[in-house]
């Protein structure tokens, strides 16, 4: 049977599966069967006598970990290999070694909302203006520090950066508050384990001995903390197999370091490198479009992607007049395919760069009766009623959890107001108590009146009754909470229709608890359930078998595949995102993101943009994404939108590249990657790439034929310019060169900042600074 399994693998896949000793780097292109390789390699390790307890497989999503676990079980029934996400693995390690980092083993994992509450309290106590220094910005800075293994003591602000100075003050206070509550945020899970392994050699050696074979999926997405953990666990037994693709590294904004995979061969000179280049997912046309696009990136490891699938249809590129036309046309097309019986709803996926772009699609699909699902697994656990019930459970599990106590002490209402809570907090701070400990002393707090003290004492008594059930099955604990707190009754008595929906959501949470109880038989079921609820991923709620159209961001689409994919709003400022402007590394990541979106498609792919789009409260003309210039013309079908009077038509999309001057050919610009830029003009067919798409004048619908265009090079940083519609403005940023040279202009008229492609632009310099 095993020989048949091996025969089903390609030579490259088999090479990876049979390499069992020493480091291994598997460079796996999209749709190349990497999960199959990982699971077969685990099965092969088991066949060669490696105990299951010595094998650790790490990935990034619960769905991927569950799929890996199920496939290993199929190949090697009865073998319990630990397949886990990084965060869940670190949470388990921390519970086993909590005292080493100053925690109790029943610590609470705070989600983003809970962490923000702690941060806001710290800012208030430190008398820092949250309007000037928002909790979100400070939280992002602290997260960056933790992902880069900078503790509160090690963090140093850069000179002349006010926010950094504030973070240097707040970070230690924030960490102290977390430790006092025996709590961690998501980033702490990694930071604490990395520092624990660094500072405790015996613990590190013990864990290295325990996990003698480590496999890491999606290695290109690891940050410094994850990299450090993996390195620390593979010193004595360097049997580390990592799988990944530098071309699919799309999480730099949350700390992922592309160098981890690019430099793997430097870290492990004796490494075996295996390339999985055959794609089993997409048509030849789709794969050629993706491969051509990603060729413009410089920080990558070249692969020769190929497929034996059919040639397939051309990739469609559609320009719509507005985002409403875009949404309605896509919805109508999907509805027609479903009605004709050619496709099921689950065959379709619509991707976008940011969630805010989904609204018009939702309306359009709903109007046509097309069932759809939004992929956001976090959404359920962020609902008020769910967070309320989970807060009760957190407090039962960890009495020092001040954030959870503040959420539930007056929920449902118990006549415990803000003034009472402030006095409790003051008492707790004075005597270094948790809020629950302070509440137990409410009768001794002189500043509390008798009524308030009695109300607090009643809550403490309620808590004590609930905590008796801490070791019971989770569904049973939840039932006691709903009944004894009066929470269910409070919602049932409400005449608010929204509260009836909340009851339905609570029933769903009870179902989740019941399913957990049926499959988990270890110690501390409540602790494990809360850990699972806290470490939900975006895609966990996505049901692959649910017969609905899927709407999701391209980040969430990672690792998935669909027969038909639509990618909307391929426009400058959205894809690539505006924050990548003038940042080559971020621009390459945006290109990788589009590459990921394209390679999710199996049979059909459409990219689209709208000439006018309402976004963030503004109606504006758009600029086509520069990535559209990088797609291979021969594989594309450009479709114009109606009416024909729109400011920019797709018929003008393709210029005759043969008529361009040599230095204006897009793929010959100086900023094109070396591996894309030909050494001679005959080294590459000139019809391979798109010509420049349009001009700012076209987009604005202005006739500038009577006035000669100003050369793009004439515009300089700081120049004051005149626009026929927006008036006077100042150039605040420049990017690109030649026909791609673009300027961001801040207008004095209140029009805000707008970006223009300068070739034949309506902008005119007033003066040059």
What spans do the regions from the language model cover?
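Acidic, low-complexity intrinsically disordered tails
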Residues: 1-3, 633-724, 730-733, 742, ...
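Conserved two-lobed SF2 helicase motor
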Residues: 83-88, 192-193, 547-554
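Conserved helicase C-terminal RecA-like lobe
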Residues: 160, 299, 344, 358-370, ...
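Conserved helicase motor core of SF1/SF2 NTP-dependent helicases
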Residues: 32, 220-309, 426-430, 437-439, ...
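Conserved P-loop NTPase-based nucleic-acid remodeling module centered on helicase motor cores
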Residues: 54-141, 146, 150-162, 169, ...
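Helicase P-loop NTPase motor core
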Residues: 30-38, 42, 269-272, 277-371, ...
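Inter-lobe coupling/hinge region of RecA-like P-loop helicase motors
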Residues: 2-10, 14-18, 22-28, 53, ...
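Conserved helicase NTPase motor core
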Residues: 2, 7-18, 22-26, 36-37, ...
């Amino acid at each position: 049977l095993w020989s048949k399994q091996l025969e089903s693998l390609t030579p490259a896949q088999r090479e990876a599966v049979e390499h069992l000793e020493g480091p291994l780097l598997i460079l796996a292109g999209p749709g190349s069967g990497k999960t199959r390789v990982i699971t077969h390699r685990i099965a092969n390790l088991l066949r060669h006598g490696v105990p299951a307890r010595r094998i650790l497989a790490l990935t990034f999503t619960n769905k991927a970990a569950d799929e890996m676990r199920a496939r290993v079980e199929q190949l090697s029934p009865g073998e319990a290999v630990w397949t886990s996400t990084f965060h869940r693995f670190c949470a388990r390690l921390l519970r086993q070694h909590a005292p080493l980092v100053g925690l109790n083993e029943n610590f609470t994992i705070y989600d983003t909302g809970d962490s923000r509450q702690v941060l806001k309290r710290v800012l208030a106590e430190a008398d820092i203006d949250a309007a000037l220094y928002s909790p979100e910005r400070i939280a992002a800075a602290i997260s960056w520090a933790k992902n880069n293994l900078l503790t509160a003591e090690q963090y140093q602000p850069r000179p002349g950066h006010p926010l950094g100075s504030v973070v240097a003050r707040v970070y230690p206070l924030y960490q102290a508050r977390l430790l006092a509550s025996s709590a961690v945020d998501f980033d702490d899970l990694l930071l604490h384990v990395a520092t624990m392994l660094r500072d405790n050699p015996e613990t590190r050696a013990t864990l290295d001995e325990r996990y003698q074979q480590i496999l890491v999926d999606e290695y290109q997405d690891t940050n410094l903390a994850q990299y450090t953990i993996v390195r620390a666990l593979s010193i004595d037994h360097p049997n580390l197999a990592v799988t990944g693709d530098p071309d699919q590294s799309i999480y730099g904004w949350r700390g992922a370091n592309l160098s981890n995979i690019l430099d793997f061969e430097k870290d492990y000179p004796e490494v075996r490198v295996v390339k999985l280049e055959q794609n089993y997912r997409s048509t030849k046309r789709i794969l050629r479009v993706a491969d051509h696009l990603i060729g413009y990136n410089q920080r990558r490891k070249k692969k020769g992607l190929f497929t034996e699938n059919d040639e397939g249809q051309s990739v469609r590129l559609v320009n719509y007049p507005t985002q409403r036309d875009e949404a309605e046309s896509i919805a109508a097309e999907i509805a027609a395919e479903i009605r004709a019986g050619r496709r099921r709803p689950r065959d379709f996926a619509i991707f976008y760069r940011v969630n805010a772009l989904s609204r018009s699609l939702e309306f359009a699909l709903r109007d046509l009766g097309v069932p759809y699902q939004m992929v956001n697994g976090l959404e359920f656990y962020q609902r008020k009623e769910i967070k309320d019930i989970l807060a009760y459970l957190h407090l039962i599990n960890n009495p020092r959890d001040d954030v959870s106590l503040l959420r539930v002490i007056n929920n449902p209402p118990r006549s415990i107001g803000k003034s009472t809570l402030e006095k409790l907090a003051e008492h707790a701070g004075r005597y270094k108590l948790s809020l629950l400990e302070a509440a137990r002393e409410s009768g001794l707090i002189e500043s509390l009146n008798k009524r308030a003290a009695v109300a607090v004492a009643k809550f403490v008594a309620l808590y004590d009754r609930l905590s008796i059930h801490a070791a019971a099955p989770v569904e049973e604990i939840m039932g006691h909470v709903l009944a004894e707190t009066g929470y269910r009754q409070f919602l049932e008595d409400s005449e608010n229709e929204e509260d009836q929906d909340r009851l339905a959501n609570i029933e769903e949470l009870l179902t989740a608890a019941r399913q957990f109880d049926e499959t988990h038989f270890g110690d501390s079921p409540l602790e494990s359930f809360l850990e699972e609820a806290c470490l939900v991923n975006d895609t966990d709620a996505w049901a692959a078998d649910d017969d609905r159209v899927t709407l999701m961001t391209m980040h969430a689409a990672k690792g998935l595949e669909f027969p038909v994919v639509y990618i909307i709003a391929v426009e400058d400022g959205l894809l690539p995102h505006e924050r990548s402007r003038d940042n080559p590394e971020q621009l390459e990541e945006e290109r990788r993101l589009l590459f990921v979106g394209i390679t999710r498609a199996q049979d059909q792919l459409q990219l689209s943009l709208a000439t006018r789009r309402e976004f963030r409260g503004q109606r504006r003309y758009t600029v086509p994404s520069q990535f559209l210039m990088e797609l291979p013309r021969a594989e594309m079908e450009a479709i114009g939108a109606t009416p024909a009077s729109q400011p920019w038509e797709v018929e003008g999309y393709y210029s005759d590249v043969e008529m361009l001057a040599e230095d204006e050919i897009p793929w010959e610009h100086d900023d094109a990657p070396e591996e894309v830029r030909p050494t001679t003009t005959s080294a590459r067919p000139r019809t391979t790439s798109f010509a420049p798409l349009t001009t700012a004048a076209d987009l604005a619908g202005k006739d500038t034929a009577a006035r000669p265009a100003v050369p793009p090079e004439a515009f300089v940083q700081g120049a004051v310019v005149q626009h026929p519609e927006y008036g006077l403005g100042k150039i605040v940023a420049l990017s690109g060169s030649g026909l791609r040279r673009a300027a961001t202009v801040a207008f004095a008229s209140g029009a805000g900042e707008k970006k223009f492609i300068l070739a034949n632009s309506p902008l005119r310099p007033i003066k040059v600074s």
